[in-house]
Each structure stands twice: as structure tokens, then as C-alpha cells.
Amino acid sequence: MTTEDVIAIRVPTPFAVGDVIVYLVKGDALTLIDAGPNTKEAARALQEQLAAVNVKLSDIEQVVLTHHHADHAGLLDVFSDEIEVIGHTFNEPYISQNQAFMDWQKRFFQKLLPELGVPFDTGKAEKLIRSAYAFSCTRSLTKSIREGMGIDGLEGWSVLEMPGHAESHIVLFHEKSGRMLGGDLLLANSSSNPILEAPKAGDVRSKPLVDYQRSLRRLSQLDPTIVFPGHGEPITSVQALIEKRFDKQRNRTEDVRRMLDEKPMTAFQVCQQLFPAVYEKELFLTMSETAGHLDVLEAEEAITSYWEGNTVYFKTMKR
């Protein structure tokens, strides 16, 4: 396969991140990597750009999801029921909008966010859940993929699990050519936010920033020659960008440690200081990142936590 076999298609989104890039891969099966959000504007842009390379929606044989977020999966609804929908099994409850899972998500965040110190009411949890699905789809996977698998019709591409930004996140790596279809693992012009997710009922929550940093270290070891990302331009200076992302994360983690050196704080209090201008508007994203830095510090045994009533406080360990 050559680089001409991967065709970038720029699809508008209603989100602050801007356009999402989906990829048409002309292998033995005509494959779309991600789909875009479920909007009329996105559907029109996708169809027009496919037509420019003489492809119709009905020609697409399979869609492979890098992860479940609405800007990547929502437009599945415009495809016929006969198309193959392929992705990590963790996509399924999100893209199918499974009601039992959505109810569990609501209960989980109704409990978690107050524990982290967020002034919260039950209506906010419901609104958060609804907003996550606003531009998504109601589809199901036809095939689940996992680490090390290949995909029929995409010879030479391997599935690698890269959780962090989403627990469902995978990339496709073509080792022979060094190319990677990277989803939101690494973006040229913005950081890829690790997002808090509800675990399976009965499980403990994941630690998205810890997972994300592990995925970045793995990406560094793989050392692809080019990453085709889910937003922005293709990335060729992969190692330099990974180090830049780590530098920013280390600096922010150190900021959090210094705050906790001064006094014990809740995660929400830390969030207010880290993101004073945007925490109210982007509460979930900023709390996800704040919780991530606290998870990293706990993993490094730099901080510990304790309960006061129903709220968790964090403090630095004595050095």
C-alpha cells in the first residue's frame, strides 16, 4: 500500500475542537476510519468529499472506529444497516446508547463528582450525560477488535489498544510503512484530553491520564514515521511532539503538587486554581484533567487522600 491509499476527509463538528478528520482507506475493502458527528453539515461534507474521489456512501464496506466520542462515531447513522461497524468492545454501550449503561453513568457521576468536591445536583449529572450523546448515533458494533488483531480488507494494518483519551481508543499501525491512523492519541495543535469515564458496574474507575501517558510512551517506542490524527494535520515529528506533550503535563502536575504543599484541597478546589477562566464553562473536561493529575501524583506516591464526610481531600506526602 502507498500513502495515496489513505485519503483525508475534513468533516465539520459543532465542538470547540473544530473539524474532525476521517480517513478513506482503499484496501481490499473500502474502509472509512471514523465517521464524524451526527449533523447535516457533517453528512454533506462527507458525501461531497467522497464524491470528489468517485466514492458514494453506499460504496463504503466498513467503518472502523478509533473511539466512541460523538465527533468520531455519530455519523454512523447515515450508513446502511448492512455495513460493518468495527471497533473496541468498549464502544458498544456508547454508540448504541444503551439505556441501562446511561442510567449507570448518571449514578456514577452523581456519586463521583460530589466526592471530588464539585457543588452538584442530580440535574447536572443528567445534563452531562445527555450532552455527551447529543451528536452521537444509535448503532451497534458488528465486529469487536482488540490488541494485535488485523482487520479484514486492511492488509498490513494492526490494531493497538491506546487508552487514555477514551478507554475504547485504538489506533491502526502499518508497521512496514511506519504509518499510523491515530485517532485522538496525538494531535498537532492541541492536547488530547484524557476523559473521566464510568467503568463497568462494580469496577473501579480508570485513571485516564495515567493510561494516556502509558499510551504516549508506547507510541514513542513504536516511533511511526507519520501519524494521521483525528484533528489537524499529519504529524511527522512524532518524538518531538510527544516530548512537548509530556513537558506540559509534567509542568501542570508539578503545579498541582505545589498547591497541595500549601494545604489539603479537594479536586474541585484544585480545578478552580488550575483553570480559573474556564472551569465553569468546561466543568467536565477541566475536572477530568484535574483528576488525571491527582491520579498521576498518587501513582508516584507524592500525595495521599483522606475523607472528610463524603468528600475526598488530597495532601502531599511528607518528604
Curated annotation (Swiss-Prot):
Task: Check the record and name the Pfam families matching this protein.
Answer: Lactamase_B
Xref: CDD domains: TTHA1429-like_MBL-fold
- The EC category is hydrolase
Superkingdom to which the source organism belongs? Bacteria
Q: Which cofactor does it need?
A: Zn(2+)
List residues binding Zn(2+) 2. Answer: 71-72, 184, 231
SMART domains this protein is in? Lactamase_B
Q: Does the keyword Isomerase apply?
A: no
PANTHER family, alphabetized: METALLO-BETA-LACTAMASE DOMAIN-CONTAINING (PTHR42951), METALLO-HYDROLASE YQJP-RELATED (PTHR42951:SF21)
What is the protein name given in its UniProt record? Probable metallo-hydrolase YqjP
Organism field: Bacillus subtilis (strain 168)
**Which gene name does the record give?**
yqjP
